[in-house]
Amino acid sequence: ALKAEKYSETDHSGIYTLDIQPYSYQQEILDKLEAERAVRGHTRNLVVAATGTGKTVISALDYKRFCKQHPGKPCRLLFVAHREEILKQSLYPFRAVLKDANFGELLVGNYKADSIDHLFISIQTFNSQDFTAKTGADFYDYIVVDEFHHAAAPTYQKLLEYYQPQILLGLTATPER
């Protein structure tokens, strides 16, 4: 419980006992992701949805499904964003969906991670710590890049070119940027 609170000014402990169910539009996106992967073999996907529609919840539900489909695997997760606040906010949907108040570690700003298996990291920290030197190309099974419209920037190229996850999921409200 202490670890869950170290990233927060508010108490979120009650949400870790609830079943998080997707809204119908979120379920439609989840179904489309599953079809793209199963039918077409596309494992690098982009979710485009308006701000506030729960793209992070969609990614957490999709990650949970991925883990259920791969029992016995470590299901290592790398969640990348360009701002600390986004990373802090993104932890809660994953913890709620997975019902695990201790899931995930922040590696951004003054936060130091004890483990890199389920990591929420800023792209700046990723690059400044030469993270690819610490992990193999297939270390992460599932990678989420939030605000994916930033991925065209040079700062994201090392990440996207190096890693070979089973799933790469981009999230954005504005793909045209």
For each feature predicted by the language model, list its residue ranges.
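SF2 helicase catalytic motif II
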Residues: 124, 133-176
